[in-house]
């Protein structure tokens, strides 16, 4: 998933840095001498993979980089880290970010520098040459702030040193407070509005610049800047209230049940293996009951394995009914969002949110979800009917309740896939997967990964691996990926992609005029700019001028290398899916190198941004990609594809149920953010019960409070449909562009040139229309949404492909 942050003038702010890239020759020499001077490099295990890659068209010099990368990741002595003996530097090679105390100083200097630029923009009205630069200067302002805010966002979550984490948090909050001021800065808004209303200036802007102008305008108006003063003040109050309620909602989710103990009768557990409870529970309560916490793993275990239906029912009711506190907070949040939308003249929060998304309106989203549900429901209902047959055989009743799902899903799997599956992990070493990804990107887009040295002080943990992304046509580094791969105490457990620096053209910056045109007696003097994130940039990228190089961080929580596996980190299949997914985001950032910070890479519509990452999941299971990627960590032998097919057939057995549940949740999200939330009698539990009766596969449960654990209602309010939407698009792109020849450079170039390179600087509907040669969807109207709904999610075709190979 993408990291989601607070923003400045934009709904998806990312971080930027100054990272000076050492020469290719120096990096390769240093990497070799530092890591391999004590022993020779053995590559015989990967000969089969290298031979296959060379046969498919990977250049020998590129494959040499892959051999080094694999050795780094699959040998314990290096942990994937290449450390230079060079001169110490600061975090991310920012020389003046060497200690935690430097963070707030950097933020303070950045704020002063931004104030100059704000004054310059505010004074642009009446000066045609300055008006023509307003959009670029707003983008530069956003880039300045994001350069510190998003770096701080990463460091406060990733840095193991609490001093650094606290300092990053202080800098983050300091600049976010200023960011909130800018979002309601009327003079900035007036300058932008003047640009858009002055036709000769507006039409002189490039397509990208016009897109950025509209983005800024929408974000200003979403902040209520066009409202009368008293309504604007109310808008700010509601926005603050929404943030407070959202944090409280998430806090209640994670800690709200920790002090709630419920006694669970032990006689209901007869017939199931309770040895897993022995040390923790039965030792403390040897007779009539055991203490359980709502939502705990113990209750989930009971739901899945207890033969007694009363045990399963009780486990469900303890976890998903009666938790009124988070539901009360959620309903306050939903009502505050409704009131906020009404202030801006919209009928609902969903209407306000979707205006700049591909879907456009709540009605379009609901139509899309209904089409998906109609296609998915028959398959899911057949599965529930089989659950009923299994239940009738065991219990004498064929009525499947919601608390029966996990138990009979397990029974269903045992019936259809009774044999033990051979493990995949021996073929899924971290080194093999990374080199396979790099080979895939080289064949598709002409880019590959090369391990690079890090200077002392550059990274936040010794295990962080730095990768250069190298383009064959430019023979140069086009971006950097820092990989923080292994689990550790205090590190977030989920995978994420952080954009640390966006692409932006910098040779057109006339920063010397900021002081001349923005200086004010009210501002403190700016002694220098050496503490700011000045970026020298690079030429190339298929465009004129100098650009910031994109930099991203890929964060996962994989198990560290195991000496029992020869020092290799062996992944589970789910880990590989995660890595492919997140690398889809990373490559979007690398290729989406635009002139403007606000539309580069993954800075595009929420319901479009997952397309490249979901498309990567299609590549992952293709035989030709598996041949590039999965090889035994000891012998180098390729993963037998039939072995993977059996695994996938089992894994996807319940896809119909899971997909139907996602459709239901996306529909619930739309209901909660509709005008219903403004009704005095609004009840989120009643809405959930009504939706279950309308669309659900199981009888509804009265007074359910499950929605109090649906955390995405805060972070993805009114946009939870996006993942399903992009699944449908990705399935179509795979089928139309890649399925016949997955490793085709022609297909890769087509996707790169029509989609990836534009970031968010072009209409997603226009990009898709050109990519798929489907003119009827270019306008993104109701018909286009219906077309995508009718495309479906593609899983039936995938399952048929798997079955055909078995």
UniProtKB/Swiss-Prot annotation:
Its main location: mitochondrion. Residues 1-29 form a transit peptide. Zn(2+) binds at residues 581, 585, 588. GO terms for biological process: peptide metabolic process; protein processing involved in protein targeting to mitochondrion. Its EC number is 3.4.24.59. Transmembrane segments: none annotated. Its cofactor is Zn(2+). This is Mitochondrial intermediate peptidase. GO terms for cellular component: mitochondrial matrix. One of its GO terms (molecular function) is metalloendopeptidase activity. The gene is OCT1. PANTHER family: MITOCHONDRIAL INTERMEDIATE PEPTIDASE, PROTEASE M3 THIMET OLIGOPEPTIDASE-RELATED. Cleaves proteins, imported into the mitochondrion, to their mature size. While most mitochondrial precursor proteins are processed to the mature form in one step by mitochondrial processing peptidase (MPP), the sequential cleavage by MIP of an octapeptide after initial processing by MPP is a required step for a subgroup of nuclear-encoded precursor proteins destined for the matrix or the inner membrane. It comes from Malassezia globosa (strain ATCC MYA-4612 / CBS 7966) (Dandruff-associated fungus). Belongs to the peptidase M3 family. Gene3D superfamilies: Collagenase (Catalytic Domain), Neurolysin, domain 3. It catalyses: Release of an N-terminal octapeptide as second stage of processing of some proteins imported into the mitochondrion. It is an enzyme of class 3 (hydrolase). Keywords: Hydrolase, Metal-binding, Metalloprotease, Mitochondrion, Protease, Transit peptide, Zinc. PROSITE patterns: ZINC_PROTEASE (PS00142). The active site is at residue 582. Binds 1 zinc ion. CDD domains: M3A_MIP (cd06457). It is found in: Mitochondrion matrix. InterPro entries: M3A_MIP, MetalloPept_cat_dom_sf, Neurolysin/TOP_dom2, Pept_M3A_M3B, Pept_M3A_M3B_dom.
């Amino acid at each position: 998933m993408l990291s989601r942050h607070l923003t400045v003038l934009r709904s998806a702010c990312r971080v930027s840095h100054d990272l000076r890239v050492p020469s290719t020759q120096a990096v390769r020499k240093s990497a070799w001498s530092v890591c391999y001077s004590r022993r020779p490099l053995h590559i015989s295990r990967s000969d089969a993979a290298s031979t296959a890659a060379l046969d498919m068209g990977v250049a020998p010099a590129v494959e040499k980089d892959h051999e080094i990368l694999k050795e780094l990741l699959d040998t314990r002595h290096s942990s994937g880290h290449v450390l230079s003996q060079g001169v110490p530097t600061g975090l991310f090679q920012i020389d003046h970010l060497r200690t935690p105390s430097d963070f707030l100083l950097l933020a303070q200097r950045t704020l002063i520098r931004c104030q100059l630029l704000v004054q310059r923009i505010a004074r642009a009205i009446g000066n045609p040459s300055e008006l023509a630069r307003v959009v670029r200067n707003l983008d530069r302002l956003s880039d300045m702030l994001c350069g510190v805010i998003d770096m701080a966002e990463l460091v406060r979550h990733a840095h193991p040193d609490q001093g650094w984490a606290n300092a990053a948090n202080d800098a983050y909050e300091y600049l976010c407070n200023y960011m909130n001021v800018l979002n309601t800065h009327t003079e900035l808004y007036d300058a932008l509005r003047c640009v858009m209303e002055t036709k000769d200036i507006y039409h002189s802007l490039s397509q990208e610049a016009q897109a950025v102008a509209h983005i800024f305008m929408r974000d200003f108006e979403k902040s209520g800047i066009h409202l009368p003063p008293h309504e604007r003040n109310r808008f700010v109050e509601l926005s603050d209230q929404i943030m407070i309620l959202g944090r409280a909602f998430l806090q209640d989710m994670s800690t709200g049940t920790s002090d709630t103990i419920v006694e669970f009768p032990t006689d209901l557990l007869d017939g199931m293996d309770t040895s897993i409870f022995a040390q923790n529970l039965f030792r403390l309560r040897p007779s009539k009951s055991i203490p359980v916490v709502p939502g705990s793993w113990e209750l989930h275990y009971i739901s899945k394995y207890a033969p007694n239906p009363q045990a399963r029912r009780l486990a469900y009711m303890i976890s998903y009914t009666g938790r009124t506190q988070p539901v009360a907070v959620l309903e306050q949040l939903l009502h505050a969002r409704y009131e906020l939308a009404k202030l801006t003249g919209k009928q609902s929060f969903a209407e306000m949110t979707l205006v700049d998304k591909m879907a456009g309106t709540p009605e379009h989203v609901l139509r899309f979800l209904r089409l998906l549900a109609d296609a998915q429901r028959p398959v899911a209902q057949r599965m529930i009917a089989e659950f009923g047959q299994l239940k009738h055989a065991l219990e004498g009743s064929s009525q499947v309740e919601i608390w029966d799902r996990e138990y009979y899903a397990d029974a269903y799997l045992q019936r259809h896939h009774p044999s033990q599956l051979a493990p995949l992990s021996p073929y899924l070493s971290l080194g093999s997967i990374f080199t396979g990804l790099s080979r895939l990107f080289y064949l598709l887009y002409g880019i590959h990964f090369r391990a690079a040295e890090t200077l002392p002080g550059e990274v936040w943990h010794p295990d962080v691996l730095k990768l250069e992304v190298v383009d064959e046509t430019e023979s140069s580094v086009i971006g950097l990926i820092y990989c923080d791969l292994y689990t550790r105490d205090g590190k977030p457990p989920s995978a994420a992609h952080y954009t640390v620096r966006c692409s932006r053209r910098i040779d057109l910056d006339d920063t010397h005029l900021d002081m001349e045109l923005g200086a004010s007696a009210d501002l403190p003097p700016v002694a220098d700019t050496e503490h700011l994130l000045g970026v020298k940039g690079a030429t190339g990228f298929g465009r004129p001028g100098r650009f910031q190089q994109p930099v991203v961080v890929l964060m996962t929580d994989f198990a560290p290398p195991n000496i029992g596996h020869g020092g290799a980190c062996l992944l589970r299949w789910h880990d590989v899916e995660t890595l492919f997914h997140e690398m889809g985001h990373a490559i979007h950032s690398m290729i989406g190198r635009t002139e403007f910070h606000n539309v580069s890479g993954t800075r595009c519509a929420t319901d479009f941004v997952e397309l490249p990452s979901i498309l990567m999941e299609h590549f992952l299971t293709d035989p030709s990609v598996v041949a590039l990627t999965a090889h035994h960590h000891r012998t180098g032998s390729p993963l037998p594809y039939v072995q993977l097919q059996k695994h996938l057939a089992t894994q996807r057995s319940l896809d119909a149920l899971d997909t139907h549940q996602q459709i239901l949740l996306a529909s619930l999200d739309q209901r909660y953010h509709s005008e219903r939330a403004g009704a005095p009698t609004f009840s989120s539990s009643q809405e959930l019960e009504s939706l279950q009766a309308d669309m659900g596969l199981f009888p509804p449960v009265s007074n359910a409070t499950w929605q109090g654990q649906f955390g995405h209602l805060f972070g993805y309010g009114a946009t939870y449909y996006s993942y399903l939407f992009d699944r449908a698009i990705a399935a179509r792109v795979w089928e139309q562009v890649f399925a016949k020849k997955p490793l085709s450079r022609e297909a890769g170039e087509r996707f790169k040139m029509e989609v990836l390179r534009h970031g968010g600087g072009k209409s997603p509907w226009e990009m898709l229309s050109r990519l798929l040669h489907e003119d009827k969807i270019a306008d993104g109207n109701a018909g286009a949404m219906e077309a995508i709904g009718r495309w479906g999610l593609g899983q039936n075709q995938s399952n048929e492909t798997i079955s055909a190979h078995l």
